[in-house]
Structure formats: structure tokens, C-alpha cells
Amino acid sequence: MKPTLPNYDQSSVLIVGDVMLDRYWGGPTSRISPEAPVPVVKVEKIEERPGGAANVAMNIAALGGDAHLVGLVGEDEPAQALTTTLESLKVHCDFVALPEFPTITKLRVMSRGQQLIRLDFEDSFHDVAAEPIISRMQQALSSVKAVVLSDYAKGALEHVQSMIQEARKVNVPVFIDPKGADFERYRGATLLTPNMLEFETVVGKVKDEDDLVAKGQQIIEEFDFEALLVTRSEHGMTLLRRNMEPLHLPTQAREVFDVTGAGDTVISVLAASVSTGKPLDEACALANAAAGVVVGKLGTSTLSTIELAEAIHGSQDSGFGIIGEEQLISAVKQARARGEKVVMTNGCFDILHAGHVSYLNHAAELGDRLIVAVNTNESVQRLKGPGRPINPTDRRMAVLAGLGAVDWVVPFSEDTPQRLISQVLPSLLVKGGDYAIEDIAGGAEVIAAGGEVKVLNFEDGCSTTGIIEAIKGGRG
């Protein structure tokens, strides 16, 4: 199955669970302490990242979705740091602050890519009244299309069964990242995402694929789930649904550097995709592609729609299509090594029309490979004003990537692509319209590197503004 990227701007997910703050202190080590036989780390870098349920919310927000996060924190500095970080990422935080408990914090001391020690600051939340967290959930349910319950056995989901029932009352699907062998407490959930170890803890050792399916179906029936998504490391994922054939999704990871937070990414992409209207099988395929990206990164990591789009294009596209900046620079180097002439252009391409297609075909004829750099949503808004773009970045790029003339599509967030062009340095930079060569962003850098800059004519009578005005005026 090759899924298509949904518009995550339309997704809205409520995340309830164990939130935590991950702190990293890193630096070089060059000596052993005279006080004890331990290395001395000269701390040069300090990082803070949301963890647990907060990482799920951060993943959804990174895709462009609306993430509403409910959890338990203390009344302390880590809670303030966590809230500040999440709100800067456009996550709506609705925490229950409990002064008698500390905010769960994990401090890792790192050196030369290795973790030397982890210090946990926590006291699992226990005997916490249900009302504060349930009432926050009830208030949020009317404005979301999916619920994620992220369980790290720290106490936020002590009343998980009540939470499931609240979501079921309003027909909102509930996705759970489980913890422990007691699946009874999750009875009635839409879907659970156990990894293979968690699955076998409940059902016993799995002998083969048939045994996995049989035991999974038994779990679904016994606990009134609609589905299970079993994540299986190098064997990919298996989606099991009531009275349906299993769906086996092979792993898409090319290299595995760190599996930290991969489960959070899986459930966040799954829930966000379902909340946009994607069917469960396609949402799982998107989650599988996302997992293949994040395990190639160090630490808890999010991914962007650009990276996800690139992942679902897959290797069959031979590295072409939607691509990130680093991958583009590498691809251009390879093209030059093959003796190919690289042409580059840029624009908003908000509503693709015949003039655009003609222009891009002409540009492609001038070389062997054509790069189209596309303004992101924020960049278009600054240039064009309120109400633009009509189509979000991922959709504009998807349309451009589908044109035969275009080899690579890459986004840029600045007002002009000057920085990007100066990194890529194409053989030929083209721009449509009546620009003077010296006014074209990036032109000076291309010429200084021995390249060319050309201005191409647009087809008369075609413009995005004209199309928008015609639609507003009701003209065909």
C-alpha cells in the first residue's frame, strides 16, 4: 500500500497521559575524577525536550495538527519549562498542577554520543482524584476528532477506563499506547499499539505469523477492541482488525540509530491521520513510514510533513519528487557527477494553471534536471497577505511533484530563496515574468559560481490572482 499524505492542518487530537521533561547535558570527557572512578564531563550543551505524552503532542503539532494535551505536573520549574516549550510549538497545554508531586523529569548526561548516566526526578502520581483530569477531557472532546491515551504507568491514566467511556459517549476513536500486561484496563478502546514484547507479555510467545494473527484476534474479541497495531521492529507492523484480513507492513527504516520515541511517533501519526478522515489501514501505513524516518534520528524526534511525504514516495522514485534541503544538495552533487545540467526555479504555485505548466516545461527543456523551490505557507502569507495560500505547502508540492517536467520539489520558509539557491548553486537559475537579471534572488551567487540566470515569459491570460477573482465572482 502506498498512502497519500493527508492535510494535517485539518487534524485535531486530544492527548491524555503521562507527560515528562527530557533533559540532556552533554560535552567532552578527557579525564577521570579524582573523587571517584568516574569520567568528568565538561558540560557545553544543554537541551530540553518534551517526553512521553508531551512528545506525542509535539509530533502532532509538528505535522501541522491541532494538539490538545492533558496531563499531570507539579508546581515547579520543570512544569514551567515544559509548558513554555510546548506552547512555543503550538501545543495547547491543559495540565493539572499538583504541588505535592514533582513534574516527571529525566536528566541524561551525554558524552561522545554515549549516555553516561540517567537521573530520574519523579514520584509516580498516585491516588489522584479523577475529576480534574476527566473534566478537562470532557471539555476538549467536543472539538477533537481522535483521542490518544499515552500510558507510561506514571499515574495520569489511573482512571483510564472512565476516559475511554467518555470518548465512546461522543463517538471519538481512542488510540492507546499501552503499558504493562493488564489489557483489561483498556477494554473498549478503538486500537492499541503494543510492541512485540508487550504483545507477548500478554499472549505468550508467538511462534509464527499465523500464531500472531490468531492470538491478536483473540485479544480483540476478549477486550472489545476494534483493532491492534503490533509494532515488530525490523519486521515492520501488523494491523489486526475484527473480522478482517491482517495487514502486514514491512519496515521502511534504512538505518536505525535510536528507537527512542518511535512508539510516540507511530501513535501520533496514526491518530492525526485518522482525524483527517483517513481509513485505518492507510493511517497505519503512514505511521509505518513515519517510524522509518524517526529511528534514523538521535533522541526523541518529530518529523515534518516534508519528511513524511519523502518517505511515502519511497525508493521507487529513485530519489526524485519531494525532498529536503540536505537530500537535494546531495542529489544535485550526484547529478553533476553524471554530467547533468541542473535548472532551478521558484515560486508560490498556489493554484497551478496552464501558464505554470507551460513555464515549467520550458524551464525543463533548458537542462537535464529541474528543481522547483516552493514558498511555505508562512512565506506565502507574508508575501501575498491574508487568505493566501489557498492550498497548503504539502498539497502544492504534491501537485508539482506529479508533473513530468519536475524532478525535485523543495520548500523554503524565507521571503526569498536566496539562501537555498546559494547552497544548491544550479547550473541555470530561471524566473518567470519581467524581472531584471540583477533583481532575481540568488542570481548573483549563481553567476559568481559560473552559472547562468535567465528570465522566461509567462503565458498570457493565466494568473492565480485572476483565477481567485473569477471564482469569487462566480465566473467559470
Curated annotation (Swiss-Prot):
Keywords assigned by UniProt, alphabetized: ATP-binding, Carbohydrate metabolism, Kinase, Multifunctional enzyme, Nucleotide-binding, Nucleotidyltransferase, Transferase
Pathway(s) it belongs to: Nucleotide-sugar biosynthesis; ADP-L-glycero-beta-D-manno-heptose biosynthesis; ADP-L-glycero-beta-D-manno-heptose from D-glycero-beta-D-manno-heptose 7-phosphate: step 1/4; Nucleotide-sugar biosynthesis; ADP-L-glycero-beta-D-manno-heptose biosynthesis; ADP-L-glycero-beta-D-manno-heptose from D-glycero-beta-D-manno-heptose 7-phosphate: step 3/4
A GO molecular-function descriptor: phosphotransferase activity, alcohol group as acceptor
Name of one Pfam family that matches: CTP_transf_like
Function: Catalyzes the ADP transfer from ATP to D-glycero-beta-D-manno-heptose 1-phosphate, yielding ADP-D-glycero-beta-D-manno-heptose.
Protein known as: Bifunctional protein HldE
Family the entry assigns: In the N-terminal section; belongs to the carbohydrate kinase PfkB family. In the C-terminal section; belongs to the cytidylyltransferase family.
Catalysed conversion reaction: D-glycero-beta-D-manno-heptose 7-phosphate + ATP = D-glycero-beta-D-manno-heptose 1,7-bisphosphate + ADP + H(+); D-glycero-beta-D-manno-heptose 1-phosphate + ATP + H(+) = ADP-D-glycero-beta-D-manno-heptose + diphosphate
Chain sites annotated for binding ATP: N195, M196, L197, E198
Gene Ontology cellular-component annotations: cytosol
Biological processes, Gene Ontology terms: ADP-L-glycero-beta-D-manno-heptose biosynthetic process
Region entry Cytidylyltransferase, spans: 344-476
Quaternary state and interactors: Homodimer.
EC number: 2.7.1.167, 2.7.7.70
Record has Cytoplasm as a keyword: no
Gene transcribed to yield this protein: hldE
Annotated catalytic residues: D264
EC top class named in words: transferase
Chain intervals for the UniProt region annotation (Ribokinase): 1-318
InterPro entries from the UniProt entry: Bifunc_HldE, Carboh/pur_kinase_PfkB_CS, Cyt_trans-like, PfkB_dom, RfaE_dom_I, RfaE_dom_II, Ribokinase-like, Rossmann-like_a/b/a_fold
Keyword Transferase on entry: yes
HAMAP family xref list: HldE
PANTHER family cross-referenced by the UniProt entry: BIFUNCTIONAL PROTEIN HLDE
